[in-house]
Amino acid sequence: MQKILISLSVILLLSFCDGNKKNSSFQLKGTLSDSKAETLYLEKLGSSKQVIIDSVILDENGNFEFTNYTPKIGFYRIKTNDKNFAMLVLDSADKVTITGSVKDLGNTFKVEGSPETTIFIEYNNLSKSRDIKLDSLNKEFQVLMETNKMDSIRMDSLSAIFEAPYNSIINRTNTLMVDKISKNTNMYSSIMAIQALDPDKYSDLYKSLDAGLSKKFPNDKNVIMFHEVVERMLSTNIGQFAPEISLPSPDGKEIALSSLKGKLVLIDFWASWCGPCRKEMPNVVKIYSKFKNKGFEIYGVSLDQDKEKWMEAITKDGINWPQVSDLKYWDNVAARIYNVQGIPYTVLIDKDGKIIAKNLRGQELEKKIAEVLK
């Protein structure tokens, strides 16, 4: 039920596209209640920074209009401060009107004249509904844990009971999200929405969105970067030959993935700081012990930054298979090549070097390995 994720938005919003001085028919205006001459800011969003590009003081009736900026397609927000804001997806041809309360922009604002923002809100509402249900389920689980003293066996049993409704909530939301994205493959907002979906499971939808966005926004940097993500994803689909990677081991010796060809190889992406990875590691150790003399090998790739902590985890967890890392965290070259969006993450490669399974863990992984090696 747990996994450390890297948001796809981090990948997609690395570039920062500037807009232009006001030179088109673009409009962004509105009326906000509860106004006391507050200053309202228009901000362009990037992955690591936000830049204020315009500001306006609301008049005595709460009216405002931004007049100094024409946006390129992208993600923006209006705000009074960093805790009171509303997200927008704006384009240069929009004529946008916003209403709501200046005291609570995020929960009260309504927008007209921005098709992209309208779709973005619909996506966001799906995510909010999912998160509310998951939060309620988690609180129920925590209450049962706190009011009942449980051994590990009973704890696992309780977790199994809650896993079904958890998966039901996720699957229901994913079904609705897939349906909406499928109908909006030319909408820029879909870039953010699709990050909630597993690229391995929904590769066809990623391809459709890539095609739609590339046709409509061929020169947009974020769309170009999304295309590159999809290209990497396709190159590591099941049935493809595993791309080569070669990284240093803890002692500095380069170990190439291809050096293990001829064996059934599991690429195991993990990190010492990743709780779910460490929790899964005893199972990986058990699997390795069971199959290592039967033509099975593991190529461990750590997304660590701190070499000492990486080596401590190797020792503490009893890891005795090949381990490599460039100590570059999420910028790890192997993670980029294999389009890793979250850890733990696994890729199973047959003796000929072809990818035969992805993201298996626990009993599913052990069963698949036994099946291939029999």
Name each model feature, range by range:
Residues 14-16:
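C-terminal motif of bacterial Sec signal peptides marking the signal peptidase cleavage site
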Residues 18-175:
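A non-transmembrane, solvent-exposed segment enriched in polar/low-complexity residues
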Residues 106, 159, 167-241:
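N-terminal targeting signals for export/organelle localization
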Residues 224-258, 321, 368-370, 374:
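N-terminal "domain-start" segment that seeds a small globular fold
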Residues 261-262, 269-286:
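Conserved redox-active cysteine motifs that mediate thiol-disulfide chemistry
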Residues 279-301, 371-374:
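Conserved helix-turn-beta segment immediately C-terminal to the redox Cys motif
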Residues 311-352:
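Short, internal strand/loop/helix patches
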Residues 351-374:
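Thiol-/selenol-based redox modules, centered on thioredoxin-like
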